[in-house]
Amino acid sequence: MELLCCEGDTVRRAQPDPALLLDDRVLHNLLTVEERYLPQCSYFKCVQKDIQPFMRRMVATWMLEVCEEQRCEEEVFPMAMNYLDRFLAVIPTRKCHLQLLGAVCMFLASKLKETIPLTAEKLCIYTDNSIKPQELLEWELVVLGKLKWNLAAVTPHDFIEHILRKLPLPKDKLLLIRKHAQTFIALCATDFNFAMYPPSMIATGSVGAAICGLQLDVGETSLSGDSLTEHLAKITSTDVDCLKACQEQIESVLVSSLRQTRQQTQQRNSSKSVDELDQASTPTDVQDINL
């Protein structure tokens, strides 16, 4: 008798729930509670003495790379950064503990959002074993205590579907717009300037930036440029000028990120070329070597 294995790597997902997406009370409740989960202060000025903004960016980039490599749910990374910012807003932390804190925050966020969460052992491997699983588990309890076990934070991803369904967008472009908006949200999470922005504003600005960047026609000719911004602001009850500034800031961060990536690529290519030249010009005669 032959056995047939039908198991696959595909994670089963629930279908979009109309009871949640078509009821404006859900959006209203999200807008009501979202600010409860924001950092209470700009902690680099008044709490942290050892940690600098560039260090946060470095650990955030590392966390994003881990989440991408492990194919985590889109919500895991922004939620982990929310935990990290809220912790740093209340507890002075040494810079040698920052990566450990980042790993703990990913550990907690994946437990909340993933079907199969990240393991402590796997996260320790991503730190080149600079931390031990037991250390991570001990810090998990510390972080939970300082966050008062309030882990179900509202993130920009919670607003995406509510915003998209209220816009007259072509159905064949929805997936592309959603992916671009999710990329912008992840980008915002790596930048401390967005840490104290309401998630609804980041979500709305990301959707606006995605639509403008893709140069899509939004159904009605009247719904473009400033009118699109006004329509988006109305959906999430956001101030139009604040939303416009947020969207411009998102686009600016994107340009900066792309420029940085391009420079790094050029540097890698140039160093590779230099290595090849060095290799080609290596003297083959021992008498040519100047000791």
Curated annotation (Swiss-Prot):
Residue segments, region Disordered: 261-291
Localisation: Nucleus; Cytoplasm; Nucleus membrane
Superkingdom assignment: Eukaryota
GO biological process, one term: G1/S transition of mitotic cell cycle
Molecular function GO labels: cyclin-dependent protein serine/threonine kinase regulator activity
Pfam families per the UniProt record, alphabetical: Cyclin_C, Cyclin_N
CDD domains assigned to the protein according to its UniProt record, in alphabetical order: CYCLIN_CCND2_rpt1 (cd20574), CYCLIN_CCND2_rpt2 (cd20577)
Main subcellular location of this protein, as a coarse class: nucleus
Polar residues compositional bias, start-end: 279-291
GO cellular component term, pick one: nucleus
Disulfide bond annotation, renumbered to this chain: none
Family matches, as InterPro entries: Cyclin, Cyclin-like_dom, Cyclin-like_sf, Cyclin_A/B-like, Cyclin_C-dom, Cyclin_N, Cyclins_cyclin-box
Reported modifications of this chain: Phosphorylation at Thr-282 by MAP kinases is required for ubiquitination and degradation by the DCX(AMBRA1) complex.
Modified residues (Phosphothreonine): 282
Record's keyword terms, sorted: Cell cycle, Cell division, Cyclin, Cytoplasm, Membrane, Nucleus, Phosphoprotein, Ubl conjugation
Known role: Regulatory component of the cyclin D2-CDK4 (DC) complex that phosphorylates and inhibits members of the retinoblastoma (RB) protein family including RB1 and regulates the cell-cycle during G(1)/S transition. Phosphorylation of RB1 allows dissociation of the transcription factor E2F from the RB/E2F complex and the subsequent transcription of E2F target genes which are responsible for the progression through the G(1) phase. Hypophosphorylates RB1 in early G(1) phase. Cyclin D-CDK4 complexes are major integrators of various mitogenenic and antimitogenic signals.
Family statement: Belongs to the cyclin family. Cyclin D subfamily.
Subunit and partners: Interacts with the cdk4 and cdk6 protein kinases to form a serine/threonine kinase holoenzyme complex. The cyclin subunit imparts substrate specificity to the complex.
Protein name as annotated: G1/S-specific cyclin-D2
